[in-house]
């Protein structure tokens, strides 16, 4: 193919999924001339698997993206068809919002946002090779021969990277949802010294909603109480006309159909070689691994208002199509369901994430960034968070500003990226609340208090929104201070209230804040006995109640975070020679050499690096010379 010089951009983003959309929008909004290149303009921010966003940990990531000035939260608030707050019976650290998306409206709305964003050009094309000179990425070449030069390139090719779809005995080269795969880009990465591995994910069948007998299933409606992903969205915009999801179950017949055909299941015949996601196994994998379970939950989720397609959740499979028909028809409510699309597995290339810096710039090629499923993660939310960070850091580097890195105590996005670049991953990485050491600080409700100031400093949060944030922050602080000054006396009314709640009576006067700390006392109860603040926002009330009730636990986490910050402040010289440091264990030395951690705290989280290694390294850094260990 004859090449030609097409154009120059400050930033080129390859791939317009959830990572690419956020990366391109961030770079453009920070004033960089940006090209967003996608294989198919009709698949911008598409949802090839579950038509939903959020859930435990992942929902908090969407809030963090919004607090930093990203688009995902605003986009889903405009296009959801159901909203539910999960884990409401548990503590605030694990509460999470989940939205059922109209996947087609989500795509259209995000595409329109991209098309109307200043400094951002959206174009269809297939990137086939990187332009690399002296270890520095200078642009890309497309399949039509167009040479686009750039100061930074961000790759977000997702599961299209040398993608291969598998349905039973059938295998063929493809990206997600039967899109065009990206083959030569993977080859270009390998030619430039990158180590790639193969992962696998899957998706369930889609069925025709008009052929489902919903009377045999359990309805799951949305919440009536307003909730939103974006801090910009007012409660008045909350959708009242929500669509329900539905729940049914597999049974003995389903399990027998699967067991009888395991000899045709790619998961067990060796056809699938890529490593699959631990926390989203296929239904055939679940039947084998959990043989004692009599049934498994199945969720029937609408894919939008203008379609009858239903996503059969928790039923991912790569069984042959004819077997998928039998599996579906064995399930209550789906006896006569017509399958519109079969489930499939897809294998794809992943850049081993130890080759990345915390900014998501690669260590192998300068000015080249990767984000999303290319880095070994699963999920739209994890991809979007990485894309946002890659776009921000590409823009910052070009303008000579310091890199933007969130640490583990600041955001789930920080936990995600630190896990990737420090520990790597041997399977598709899913963000879980259990991965965060400071999850009481990383809540759904306080993402704006954690990150809005940072988003404003980056230029991604405008002044009007920042002013609204400061008003909320001041209101929270004022109410917390007020409750520390008001005293309640053991009046007959208060004692009767406490008795009705099963709480111990007051013996003496007590501060309003201490009264609120009682497990059965809500803020709404408290203001029966003290003057109410007129017009106080319910989000302020939520914040006050959580901060008061969990003050002791929050203070403990703050103390741990202060210790972490001290370790993060101990920078490791970029040119350090680990071979020159006597006393390091062999495994620790090898891991440190491979990962090249930037701080002592990051080094301490590397698997195989023991506390003694950290002690030796700490002495070396402090003394600035080789640590002698007897």
From Swiss-Prot:
Known cofactor(s): FAD
A Pfam family recorded for this sequence: SAM_GIDA_C
GO annotation, cellular component aspect: cytosol
The keyword tRNA processing is assigned to this record: yes
Biological process per Gene Ontology, one example term: tRNA wobble uridine modification
Binding-site list for NAD(+): 276-290
UniProt-annotated location(s): Cytoplasm
GO molecular function, one term: flavin adenine dinucleotide binding
Cited NCBIfam families: mnmG_gidA (TIGR00136)
Known role: NAD-binding protein involved in the addition of a carboxymethylaminomethyl (cmnm) group at the wobble position (U34) of certain tRNAs, forming tRNA-cmnm(5)s(2)U34.
Quaternary structure and interacting proteins, as annotated: Homodimer. Heterotetramer of two MnmE and two MnmG subunits.
Listed name of the protein: tRNA uridine 5-carboxymethylaminomethyl modification enzyme MnmG
